[in-house]
Amino acid sequence: MKSLPILLLLCVAVCSAYPLDGAARGEDTSMNLVQKYLENYYDLKKDVKQFVRRKDSGPVVKKIREMQKFLGLEVTGKLDSDTLEVMRKPRCGVPDVGHFRTFPGIPKWRKTHLTYRIVNYTPDLPKDAVDSAVEKALKVWEEVTPLTFSRLYEGEADIMISFAVREHGDFYPFDGPGNVLAHAYAPGPGINGDAHFDDDEQWTKDTTGTNLFLVAAHEIGHSLGLFHSANTEALMYPLYHSLTDLTRFRLSQDDINGIQSLYGPPPDSPETPLVPTEPVPPEPGTPANCDPALSFDAVSTLRGEILIFKDRHFWRKSLRKLEPELHLISSFWPSLPSGVDAAYEVTSKDLVFIFKGNQFWAIRGNEVRAGYPRGIHTLGFPPTVRKIDAAISDKEKNKTYFFVEDKYWRFDEKRNSMEPGFPKQIAEDFPGIDSKIDAVFEEFGFFYFFTGSSQLEFDPNAKKVTHTLKSNSWLNC
């Protein structure tokens, strides 16, 4: 057991939150906060008890200056209000270092295929929302490395993910709501690589409370071997960032540099769609990303990327690149038509289905499958249905929803047949979605319905619209 403290010092990453209560704190309380902060994160020796207020040479002043420089504050060495405010913000508890860094000793996984297991669930969210947040967090890192992940439902996985309160068996007890958020361990056997989340926090899938996806993505960075970054835009920056719009999330180049220093870039794979080296240059008729009146024909995912179709073009949005790329549909799939009506991905089949008029095509990567196009009526639609407005596949339930005017049908992907009892009214089961739907797709556990230049973020579990956004927010507008 004598080696355990050293092991934990090297491997544990504890996320701590210091809530701002808005009340004035006494000087002694502030000094105690600063003392502990500098001890925990900037290696201030614990026997340094007196703060030097007038000399720039004091050890505490030096550490304050170091902290201010690292976190992007004005470097004064003084305990101004900005410095104290930052010290109280949610953050990870591992010491701060410059730029991206790995843990001491540079621990990393010696294999590229890793397993994970969700041991238990928080009552704050439906199980499928937790599953989706974790899957998306893993995908953040999978997109930019050779790493792949698969889920185990029993036994020991490389990354064990669990929710717990207070003492939970790893010598780092949680402390109730508002302080420690989560902690994760660097790569290695046993507890190493695992991520624990404080179940006294209010976990959410949106921008209220503590967003599970954002915290999980950060913690998994630690599970893969990353330390902290001084880059304020980085996911691995020590302070917790709550986004007002999750559609704008992207991995910073600093994070990419860090993880690729451990594992390298993603390999070229025959399973990955072939990409033209350059997006199409602007020309007459090319849609402008940030046109306030921009609407979309169809939206789908494809192996972790987002495809947004408009006329004869489509945007490709990937975590690997900061900006979405615009391409001609014909440059990927020469036999597909322009101006498609609907698109959706069935991840279990590794297929994307594209609809136009009374026909549909199946694509896998950059290949249109043989035997297509087929008529939409082979799916079980009545002759009165001439086209599909929008479609989305719920991967947790293995059901696909087809939207046609003010009604919708549901298709069972396992049985490969339309379910009885449909169509139903969209407004009854999707309250708040009362306009004609141009496109729809799923991300972050939400359904995003596009109508003209607007989109509605819909929570399928709560059955309500949670946000109204511009359609082109996915294009960084």
UniProtKB/Swiss-Prot annotation:
Q: Where in the cell is it found?
A: Secreted, Extracellular space, Extracellular matrix; Nucleus; Cytoplasm
> Which residues are noted in the entry as Ca(2+) 1-binding?
D124, D199, E201
Biased-composition ranges for Pro residues? 276-285
One cellular component (GO) term of this entry: nucleus
The SS bond pairs are C290-C477
- UniProt cofactor note: Binds 4 Ca(2+) ions per subunit. Binds 2 Zn(2+) ions per subunit.
Can you name one GO molecular function term for this protein?
Answer: serine-type endopeptidase activity
Cytoplasm: present as a keyword of the record? yes
Show me the Hemopexin repeat boundaries. 287-336, 337-383, 385-433, 434-477
Q: From the UniProt record, list the reaction(s) this protein catalyses.
A: Preferential cleavage where P1', P2' and P3' are hydrophobic residues
Catalytic center at which residues? E219
**Binding-site residues for Ca(2+) 4, renumbered to this chain:** D297, D389, D438
Q: Per its UniProt entry, what is the enzyme's top EC class, as one word?
A: hydrolase
Source taxon at top rank: Eukaryota
Chain residues in the propeptide? 18-99
The record's listing under PROSITE patterns reads: CYSTEINE_SWITCH, HEMOPEXIN, HEMOPEXIN_2, ZINC_PROTEASE
Q: What is the activity regulation comment for this entry?
A: Enzymatic activity is activated by HTRA2 in dopaminergic cells upon mitochondrial stress.
The alphabetical list of record keywords is: Calcium, Collagen degradation, Cytoplasm, Disulfide bond, Extracellular matrix, Hydrolase, Immunity, Innate immunity, Metal-binding, Metalloprotease, Nucleus, Protease, Repeat, Secreted, Signal, Zinc, Zymogen
Record EC number = 3.4.24.17
Q: Where is the signal peptide?
A: 1-17
- Family stated for the protein in its record: Belongs to the peptidase M10A family.
Q: What is known of its domains?
A: The conserved cysteine present in the cysteine-switch motif binds the catalytic zinc ion, thus inhibiting the enzyme. The dissociation of the cysteine from the zinc ion upon the activation-peptide release activates the enzyme.
Q: What does this protein do?
A: Metalloproteinase with a rather broad substrate specificity that can degrade fibronectin, laminin, gelatins of type I, III, IV, and V; collagens III, IV, X, and IX, and cartilage proteoglycans. Activates different molecules including growth factors, plasminogen or other matrix metalloproteinases such as MMP9. Once released into the extracellular matrix (ECM), the inactive pro-enzyme is activated by the plasmin cascade signaling pathway. Also acts intracellularly.
Q: What is this protein called?
A: Stromelysin-1
Q: Which gene encodes it?
A: MMP3
